[in-house]
Amino acid sequence: MAKKIFYTSEARDKVLSGAKQLYDAVKVTFGPKGQNVVIEKSYGAPTITHDGVTVAEAVELPSDEENLGEAIGAKLIKTAAQKLNKVAGDGTTTVTVLTYNILAEANKLIAAGVNPMELRKGIEDAGAEIIKGIEKSAEKIEGNDSKVAEVASISAG
């Protein structure tokens, strides 16, 4: 089977559209006051959750030729959430919101003529600076049971 190759602004718009569909479903779960989402399944009772990765994994877009770009966009965001969940176990809604917004802004910049490779380098450089800042301001909690419990309580919602 031949592979479908997307390019130009039409392709970017399709990818962004799929990413936005997943983003819209997940963003409502953001933060301690995040809303619940009802997920209908083909079997059993619906699932009610405010867990971003659970919502992301439930979003399924058609991947036929006409909708492939949208399916790819949703998969980009879903993959970021799944990877973070595997590594950190939390923050999946945050990574969904950040990833979608970076993608949306990058799409605007590329449409305005910014070189995509230079844009990628800028995003990677900014990410490295953010990591340095977080590491600098991070507080070690290993061995401090009350701090560990406090962080776990915040994370649990």
Model segments located where?
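N-terminal glycine-/lysine-enriched basic segments
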Residues: 1-157
